[in-house]
Structure formats: C-alpha cells, structure tokens
C-alpha cells in the first residue's frame, strides 16, 4: 500500500518540502533560522490577530485600547508583550539568517536571495507601522520623522508625504491606514515566504563547505526536524524569559506617554532593530543623501552576488574574508549603539566613520580580498 503522504495532492507538497526533502548532511545550527523565522511569523500573525480584536485604530482611543488589552482582556498582557518582543526575536533571527547567507555564500542563489531582500523590506515596513499603533509619544514622533523623509524626494516629495499622511500631519487618517497595512502585510510576507522556499527547493540548500553535496544527502525528517525543534525550544525559552521577566527591556519609556503633537521627545529614535539604519541616515548632513543611504544600507545586499570574486562560495576556508566579515558585524553593532545616542560630538563622527566603513567593506574590501585570496591559492 502506498503512503498517503506521498500520493495525496496536498500532503505530497508538504512531504517533499518537510519530510522527504534531501538535505546536505553537514548543515550546522546556522541553518536553523529559516524555520525559526517561519515560527516567528506564525506567532506574530496569531498574537496580532487576537490583539486586533481589541484594538481601536482611532487617535482618541488607540492608546487606551492598548492599556485596556493589558489590564482587562484575559491574558491580554501576554499577547501584547509576545507580539512586541516577538518582533525583536523576529529581527534577531532575520539578521542572523542574512549573516549566515553572507558568510556561507548563499547569496549565489540569486532568486532566493532577492526574494529574501524583498522579505526583509516587507518585515521592516510592517514593524515600523506596528510601532506607530500604540499611539505613544515615540509612536507619533517616529511616524512623523520617518514618513517626513519622503519629502526629500524631488518634485513629488511633499505631495507624497501628504498623500501617505492623509492630511497635513500624522493624524487619525494615518493611524487608520497604518493599522490596515500592518494587518495586511504579514499575509503578503507569508506568500513571499512560499516563493522564497520555492526558489530554494529549485536549487537545493547550500552547506557550510560551499562544495556541492549532491552525493551526500539525508532526509530532512527526522534529522533536521529534531534539530529545528531544539532551536525552537531555545528561542521560545529566550522569548518567554524576556516576556515574563522584563517585557519592557527593549521598548522606549516615552511610549508610555500618550502621543502629544505639541511636545517633542528629547531623543526621537526607532526600535533597536532599526538603529543601525537610523545611524547611517543621520550620519549624512543632507536630507536626500541620508534617505538614499538609508535605503541603500539594505539594498546593497542585492549587489553582493555581483561582487562575489572568490573562486570559493563559502568563507569557511577564507580566513581574510572571515576577518572582514566579523569587522562588518562589529561595525553594525557600533552603528546600532550610535543610532541610540544623541546627535552630538563624538557620536556624530563615530557614526560617519562607521557608515563609510559599512559600505566600504561590502562594496570595496570584500571583492578585493576575494580576488587576493584567489591569487594566494595559486602559491
């Protein structure tokens, strides 16, 4: 008798993606983050759905509705903090996933990589709009500052900003549309995830060595399902510890004050996961230049496959490239720190130096070192 999972039209697709999928035998824990991101997305959609049942997207009641969720709704507090800190977990996994792709040369699978960049932009847009919804001080001023950046676009900038705002300032219309898009985007992200996986399964997964592993494959289940479950347990432990012991650790205290258009907070800053891009934005004294640098800080990933000069795919056998990669990681951590500091000396100059280094490593040093290592291989 044939197995139903191999014959049923729907189960067959799941079987070929999750059970009988041939996977390289040498995958490390760095390959866990794809499944963790899928679980993060599911958690965010579920908690978000229940939060949306009690939230009101009106400037007069939005702040109070979030308070109501935390105080009066059964387990509303845990839903709210799972959703808020789940976003932080999402970005931790995202950045580690992208870092893994850079280190092991997974960007050579250009279709998968480009869909991944689209996903990154979509998740960032969703997180930004979600941060506006509680309608606290930082929500309001963050929305004002970031949307106002679009006014730097020549000719159409001002009209575009007013069109997004639905008026002459961030107000009721803005909040309502942000809620609508914040609700819609995760489902678009889920569809893009399917496309991401479709392209991945066309080529098969990369592995730490960067050497084709067609001769040494093992079934995804049980080997990698059990490995993914371990990763899931570690992530859930970290998330639940954060939610239950210090749920406001990563938030901004200013967001516990209702939005007041007449009172600007002393330091307007986004959530921690956007600070590196915010630091790059602030390090350029020109408004349009800053906006371009902000977009390019993520979009630069799209040209990484074109700049791959090395004869080896992975960095595992390339010590010079490894040094450069970890310098990039340190630089991003420095940018994250600078993004949270006030705009004053010495933070400004450190931010500018770190921004220049960020683009230099990716656009200049990585390709140069790759070429150099090719020559060293001939010796």
From Swiss-Prot:
Amino-acid positions noted as binding heme b b566 in the UniProt annotation, renumbered to this chain: 97, 196
Transmembrane helix as UniProt keyword: yes
Gene3D superfamilies, per the entry: Cytochrome Bc1 Complex, Chain C
Designated name of the protein: Cytochrome b
Gene transcribed to yield this protein: MT-CYB
Membrane topology: Multi-pass membrane protein
Native source organism of the sequence: Micronycteris giovanniae
List of residues binding a ubiquinone: 201
Record SUPFAM superfamilies: a domain/subunit of cytochrome bc1 complex (Ubiquinol-cytochrome c reductase), Transmembrane di-heme cytochromes
Assembly mode: The cytochrome bc1 complex contains 11 subunits: 3 respiratory subunits (MT-CYB, CYC1 and UQCRFS1), 2 core proteins (UQCRC1 and UQCRC2) and 6 low-molecular weight proteins (UQCRH/QCR6, UQCRB/QCR7, UQCRQ/QCR8, UQCR10/QCR9, UQCR11/QCR10 and a cleavage product of UQCRFS1). This cytochrome bc1 complex then forms a dimer.
Binding site for heme b b562: 83, 182
Family recorded in the similarity comment: Belongs to the cytochrome b family.
């Amino acid at each position: 008798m044939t197995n139903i999972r191999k014959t049923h039209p729907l189960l067959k697709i799941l079987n070929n993606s999750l059970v009988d999928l041939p996977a390289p035998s040498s995958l490390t824990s760095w390959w866990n983050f794809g499944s963790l991101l899928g679980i993060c997305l599911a958690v965010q959609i579920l908690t978000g759905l229940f939060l949306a049942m009690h939230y009101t997207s009106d400037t007069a009641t939005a702040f109070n509705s979030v308070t109501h969720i935390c105080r009066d709704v059964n387990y509303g507090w845990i839903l709210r903090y799972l959703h808020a800190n789940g976003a932080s977990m999402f970005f931790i996994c995202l950045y580690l996933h992208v870092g893994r792709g850079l280190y092991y040369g997974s960007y050579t699978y250009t279709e998968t990589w480009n869909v991944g960049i689209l996903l990154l932009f979509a998740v960032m847009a969703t997180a930004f709009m979600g941060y506006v919804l509680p309608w606290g001080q930082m929500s309001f001023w963050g929305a004002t500052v970031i949307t106002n950046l679009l006014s730097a676009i020549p000719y159409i900038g001002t009209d575009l900003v007013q069109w997004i705002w639905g008026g002459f300032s961030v107000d009721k219309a803005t909040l309502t549309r942000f809620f609508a898009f914040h609700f819609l985007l995760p489902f678009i992200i889920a569809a893009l995830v399917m496309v991401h996986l479709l392209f991945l399964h066309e080529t098969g997964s990369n592995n730490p060595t960067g050497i084709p592993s067609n001769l040494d494959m093992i079934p995804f289940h049980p080997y990698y399902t059990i490995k993914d479950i371990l990763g899931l347990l570690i992530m859930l432990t970290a998330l639940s510890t954060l939610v239950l012991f210090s749920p406001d650790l990563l938030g901004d205290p200013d967001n516990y004050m209702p939005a007041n258009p007449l009172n600007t907070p002393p330091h307007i800053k986004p959530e921690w996961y956007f600070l590196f891009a915010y630091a790059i934005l602030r390090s350029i004294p020109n408004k349009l230049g800053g906006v371009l640098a902000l977009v390019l800080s993520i979009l630069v990933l799209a040209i990484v496959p074109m700049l791959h000069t090395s004869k080896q795919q992975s960095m595992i056998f390339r010590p010079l490239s490894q040094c450069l990669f970890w310098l990039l990681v340190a630089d991003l951590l420095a940018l994250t720190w600078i993004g949270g500091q006030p705009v004053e000396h010495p933070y400004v100059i450190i931010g500018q130096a770190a921004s220049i280094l960020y683009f230099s490593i990716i656009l200049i040093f990585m390709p140069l070192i790759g070429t150099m290592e090719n020559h060293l291989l001939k010796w």
